[in-house]
Design a protein with these regions (language model features):
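Glycine-rich nucleotide/cofactor/substrate-binding loop typically near the N-terminus or early
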Residues: 1-29, 151-167, 172-174
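Glycine-rich, Lys/Arg-enriched anion-binding loops that position phosphate/diphosphate groups
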Residues: 96-128, 140
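Solvent-exposed alpha-helices and their adjacent loops that cap or buttress functional pockets
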Residues: 44-48, 53-55, 71, 76-81, ...
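Glycine-rich phosphate/adenosyl-contacting loop at the front of the ribokinase-like
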Residues: 250-283
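Active-site glycine-rich loop that binds ribose-phosphate moieties when present
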Residues: 36-39, 67-80, 84-105, 138-144
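General beta-strand structural signal in soluble alpha/beta enzymes
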Residues: 35-38, 53-58, 64, 86-88, ...
Length: 283
């Protein structure tokens, strides 16, 4: 919805633009500031206008040491209350991926991988060491799963993890080593909170001499390809009338219908309270 000049203006803002999550939206809008939305902020806007799916690089998560600092990305809580599917390359390895997946499970967020593997991707590498319960092998399958989430009126979102293309996954080991070094650098400089991620990514780019940026671009392009294919299939479901609408259960054919009359059995109990008012002193 932006003009070319508006896009150029925002792109030139750089770090002056406010990192905008759910908590920042009202302040940024009321003050007329320029903000760049996080996954959380984008989910809020998408849910408001009925956009059921969008693509990003990776989602935020639970930071290491969160049991002391409570440093948990607002992306996760938003996924638990906005019915929007997020297509991404998983969670950056600078975060505690295991606890991130546990948090999403607790908040009722469906997490699935795209492809044959159940292993959740770790942004720069296809393998995080953590498996998720579900995977979708085709855009059609992913769209159907999103459709059912909308049909049931669930208020939670979904995460579809797309592994980085194999052509760039070979850089994973080098990038992982650089990430660990960058984390140590951030700790020594006492960088914390929302400043950690941009610092680490910039430092990793320096340590890998631009290779991490190349891999980052490749995975975002791949996410966009997969996400657009899923969106197309979801649009087809909308055209045939199943999108976001409850589907009727097909009638059982006579061939498979029960041959005998079945009497239902109800097991359980109920408590009923009676209130009575006496009209006579002696009953």
């Amino acid at each position: 919805g932006l003009t070319r000049s508006e896009l150029e203006y925002i792109s030139k803002m750089g770090k002056s633009a406010i990192k905008t999550s759910r908590r920042d939206l009202s302040a940024v809008l009321s003050k007329g500031l320029v903000g760049g939305t996080t996954v959380s902020g984008t989910m809020v806007a998408s849910a408001m206008v009925g956009i059921p799916i969008f693509v990003t690089g990776g989602i935020g998560g639970v930071h290491y040491g969160a049991e002391r600092t409570f440093d948990v990305s607002a992306d996760l809580s938003e996924l638990g209350r906005s019915p929007v599917a997020v297509v991404c390359a998983g969670v950056k390895s600078i975060l505690d991926i295991g606890l991130t997946l546990e948090y999403l499970e607790t908040h009722g967020v469906t997490v699935a991988t795209f492809g044959d593997s159940l292993e959740f991707p770790a942004f720069f590498t296809p393998n995080s060491g953590f498996k998720v319960p579900y995977n979708v092998k085709t855009p059609e399958e992913a769209a159907t799963m999103i459709d059912y989430n909308l049909q049931m009126g669930l208020k939670s979102g979904m995460v579809i993890g797309v592994p980085i293309p194999e052509s760039h996954a070979v850089l994973g080991t080098q990038i992982e080593a650089a990430i660990q070094q960058a984390l140590q650098d951030a700790k020594s400089k006492r960088i914390s909170g929302k400043e950690v991620t941009p610092f680490v990514l910039q430092r990793v780019n320096q340590l890998t001499k631009g290779k991490s940026l190349e891999a980052n671009i490749a995975l975002i392009q791949n996410n966009a390809l997969v996400g657009s294919q899923i969106a197309l299939e979801l649009s087809k479901l909308r055209e045939i009338g199943t999108y976001g609408k409850p589907q009727t259960i097909p009638n059982i054919s006579e061939e498979h219908a029960p041959k005998t009359k079945i009497q239902p059995v109800v097991i359980g109990g109920s408590n009923v309270d009676f209130t009575a008012k006496a009209n006579f002193e002696i009953m």
